[in-house]
Amino acid sequence: NGVLLAQITPRGGRIPGTSSIVQLDAWNWEDATIKTDDGIHLNWPRSYSRAGWWAEPGGIEMNKNYDPQVKAIQEYFDNAFAYLGSKNTKKDIPYEAMKGLQSGEKTLFVNANGEKEIIDAVLFKKKNNIKNMTIVGGYYAFKVGALLKENNVSVLLNRVHSLPLLEDEDVNLPYKNAKLLVDAGVLVGLQNAGDMERMQTR
């Protein structure tokens, strides 16, 4: 379907792992590899959740565990960077994977859509001296475009062929999101993660 390159990305858990960039016309994985371990992926906690399901959506509920979950992320990164800065000869594979975030060799890809979550992720970047960060999803990133530009944070938006998250939002918001961010000076890309990805790329 004309797709030349792809980022192969892990899923599941708070820190799914590392991704790599590959070309899709290749004989094997060694031939396909363009850049190995280009980034670490982090699923940022949601400050709220919506009850019910798609046919019968419920109300919006606050996540009472949001602050403890963010604290747990910070503690993990503290431990990882302390390990990387030590002379410990015993290898810890999960902590080893964090190498390169502060030097800029790897990008931290943060899955976040809410305004609060995105702000907290940017503050997390500054606190931990992480050089490169990309917000993945970024539905409400346009509300904090100035902050993203100031901190050199790029955004990978979700599918533009989507309905708004809330009933009273502009029905065209998913289409306009990229333009709003570009106007704010933010580097923007489109990604296609989710259900039925192969059909969506046709």
Language-model segment annotations:
Residues 8, 111-113, 136-138, 156-160, ...:
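Generic beta-strand/beta-sheet core signal
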Residues 119-122, 126-160:
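A contiguous, well-structured "functional interface" segment within a domain
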Residues 13-16, 47-51, 116-118, 141-145, ...:
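Flexible loop/turn segments at secondary-structure boundaries
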Residues 2-132:
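Polyanionic/metal-chelating signatures
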Residues 70, 74, 95, 118, ...:
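Extracytoplasmic/secreted envelope proteins and their assembly/folding machinery
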Residues 1, 107, 146-149, 154-202:
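His/Asp/Glu-enriched, well-ordered alpha-helical/loop segment
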Residues 90-91, 110-114, 136-139, 166-174:
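A general structural motif
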Residues 76-79, 98-103, 134-138, 158-164, ...:
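Short, mixed-charge, low-aromatic patches
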